[in-house]
């Protein structure tokens, strides 16, 4: 990786665009801009690109990335940037999603069908999928569109509204009514309406709540999150691309550099340089941690909005109302990450092979209980989690015969009431492994090393405010033309020359590339 | 005579209002009530000899002034006496008084937090703005957005225009306000836990949401949506208890020639040729009318008093899915005298308003957590009010007219289980008792 990242700026270099942060959205944006002929520099604070998708050696010989699978990476982006030529396989076999059961049968959701449930549930799943796919298809075009500003009389903006209205209308009266009814329903109500099996309900609601401060009983945005995640062809099924998520990051880096973008690592940005005169403000460059300044026509931030405006720009350059709207963004993370180095493949009770995406949440109440603790700033007694063993799919992640277990653990509060300490981290890590051991009894003896990253750790290691996956909660008031706030929702900001291109913008988080793509389109407009 | 222009099922206050308006418009109406009393939740009942309770609903503010005027309810005996203030009992000796008098309210806020005292102006101004849009829609029929009927399209355009007129910034603030949690919204303004809890307590009662649930912020509109006699945001108790509202509506109905029958439960709505044509009562009587209006909830209407085969396809299933989740219980207590509360300078304020018992939003949320999981809360959110002598019904003795009622987060799964009922009563009482030096109270 590093040979392509070590081009040294001579101080006088001038770029068309500087992108702050080489997370996947920053790389997507860089690749599009470079492809269109811009001179682009990507500045990354850590020593490798990829952000939360970057692979790290957490124990000698064992590698993992915080994001451990992808589910709805935009196929448009993959083909535009010719990622296949750079090593990314879009058509990777999808993983079965397995809801683990302690005493009866595991529930497996794979390729549009169910096993391990009653035939009633299996039939209901067909109805459920048909309806959800219908709605997901209806919304799909909008994830790759720039959301218009309300009140705009621009024809293209009005067309976007008309398009959305038409798409909803085209579904027919019954579907339209049903969409309006369920769009803001808590995941729990939706699942209860369709299914009986508790594990199935917990497993399917998982994708509605993970990543945000939400649980199955929370109304408003869980169903939209589910639909967002079903937008691409895999219909929300997860996959591990060749080389893991890091493989995708590498293909993006390769595509960007092939088009002429420079990626500089170990180059953390301290400040965005703002020029002010009688005509207003203008972002004209950045200052690195070591004092070096680099000039560019525009600065594009792939870091989260709070960090961008409050740390890199500084409130002295912002209008107070705007500052307040950025300050009140809700971006406290509630997902922790567990990486375990194992001396063999863990054996889960009555599961042939742990090669799927495994959910440990016996029912929706278990998820809700874990959330109840976390929302009060406490550690959950019984954490719930999503597990992947990436080394099953990519042997290079661990020494021969050994394995990496990667788990998203919910709900672990960013703001722990007593404050985060090493012993608090150990405590929640122990509880998580206890849960694991209930389903994989021999796992404790297999553990060589474990690493538990709380949201605070994620914030520190990955420079993402609140340790939040999505840079800001996926909630109604932080979506669409309100993400991150209305003056910065079209990828530009109140400061001319400063743009946003990552998960803090429409359409939001997860590894999709959509925000990076949309931002590049707006910049090139 | 068993032939009318309109039959209204259920003499709750909406049924009464509907019947009164139809009667006033010249229709020959009959209002059918299953109980032997009218008013539904808006009733005054003598549950204990000599004590008249507002046995279910307990305070009035949201009743629309237009109805008051149109039906001339004052002439039919309705007089709402405003609260002068309310008191929130926090943990220990913490107390927060909210007064309708602005200066007193400001001074009291300052005692808790000077910052919050300043923020209150912003809070009130913002809420009042949000309420304006809703106020405009309250007396209109919501449109069916899937319909192409001119009336629906016109109404939809009306809503769109009202929203559009707000301007960009306001639209976003509205979306935010109506979708975030009460706790998140209050955090934007206040720092004192007690103040925040007191503010949230006005509306959270009766919802199946916690103060941390997305979308619960709208409950704060209870501070500004209603009014007493035009005084925005005021709360009050009707003279004679909540039943006085129903009595005045019934009087208006009868004045306009409408008929009111109690002990007349409807067994089934009669449908002929896909049109409702009347009802069959529980006693077997048949009443016919061109219009049948149900004041029962949608679920009861479609799943209990209608034959599934009479309904268009899908309606039964939808009504069955309709979510109705009770979250509050109520205790009515007859006291031999005014209890003395700790931490109050005197009983002036509680004589003139409501009481809430909650120390923080977190406490309220924890009570909701218990409800969610079907458990009783050890520390339920409790709200009450006294019937003060000044608004006692004139036929009761002056000395003993006081009462507490409490609503609290509690599981609805076990409603009706006598022993459990006592358990929740005592949980609620114990939470009050820590603030009360009770004098010979009896339940």
How would you label these PLM feature ranges?
Chain A
Residues 13, 240-242, 261, 268-399:
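Mid-domain catalytic core of redox enzymes
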Residues 1-17, 35-36, 479-481, 485-486, ...:
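Extreme N-terminal leader/targeting segments of oxidoreductases
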Residues 503-524:
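A conserved FAD-binding loop/helix module that cradles the flavin
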Residues 92, 265-267:
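Short loop/edge segments at beta-strand edges and connector loops
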Residues 8-151, 471:
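N-terminal glycine-rich phosphate/pyrophosphate-binding loop and immediately adjacent elements
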